Amino acid sequence: MEAIQVNFIELLKRSTATHISLAEELSELLKISLDSVYRRLRCETDITLSETFAICKHFNIPLEALAEINSNMVAFRINKLSNSAESFSQYLQVLHGDLNWMMKYPNHHLIYAAEDLPVFYHFFFPNLALFKMVYWNKSILNAESLQGKTIEEIQLPPTWLEEVPKVRDVFLKIPTTEIWNDDTLKSSIQQIKFYWEAGFFQKKETILAILEDLDGILAMATKQAAMGKKYNPIKDQYYDVEYSMYGCELMIGNNTVFLTSDTHQASYIGYNSFNFMRSNNRYFNESNEGWLRNMISKSTPLSLVAEKSRNQFFRAIYASIDKLRQQVLND
């Protein structure tokens, strides 16, 4: 039993911000003295089941995380989405909250293996952002309010528009390593093509503006890779935040994100098209980081001086966008 409590306390420490006094927080939460808290932290006194429930609820720790004592068991937190507008607002809030959570810890870094276009990029380009949020909610979540409408007829809920800049701004502040392959934009291009062929656009100008935003994303990624810094295309401004990019010829297989710092880590695995499930499990994080490092070692650097490789990589993706553009123009 003591081993489980030791494991739980270590998990608790990894789940709290460094500026928080854990002992004082627990004292207030459990309504016990600091001395009683320290006895629990030193495993001299057992943490009761009711106290465990209260702690897990307060610090957003799943009870299943106690299984971390067994390296073959992993607990995940998911964003439970429905077909309501409020549900997607919560998705954006969680996205923003998780990035802010990692920002609290020293030497934070984000590694993103992108089977699909990293979600953050959409939010810098309004036409593409509108399309993707409509696609996710209409076609994936089956939102009733969006059915039977074309893109031009849809107005996004104000709560979505309020959250998008928050996610965008925090992303610009986090040092990032991205792994792309030739198919990273393929799904977005296919989704746009499907909506065009299905009659969900009233005007060619709408889809052409979305394709122009895809060009803009490639320009943004190119500028970031060339300078090794984050870039905001809205303000045409570079940030002194590290950015590196790799082109991978291997099949990535799934969107995989690893948030790391000196003291805290979290892994995110994509599911249901655009959603993510998160784990703070130490063993899973070690495995995930090892896989990502291996993918990087087998990839081609596209940042800074790798101009030839960078140009070749993006040229092929530009060609895929232009192919759909010509199809629309000739239709």
Regions found by a protein language model. Give the residues of each.
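Hydrophobic protein-protein interaction segments
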Residues: 138-309, 313
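Short N-terminal signal/transit or membrane-insertion segments
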Residues: 89-116, 176-205, 331
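Basic, Lys/Arg-rich alpha-helical nucleic-acid-recognition elements, primarily the DNA-binding modules
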Residues: 1-79
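Generic detection of long, well-ordered alpha-helical segments
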Residues: 2, 16, 89, 204-211
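Long, charge-rich alpha-helical interaction segments
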Residues: 320, 324-331
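Exposed alpha-helical structural elements
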Residues: 7, 25, 36, 87-90, ...
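Helix-turn-helix/homeodomain-like alpha-helical modules used for DNA recognition
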Residues: 71-149
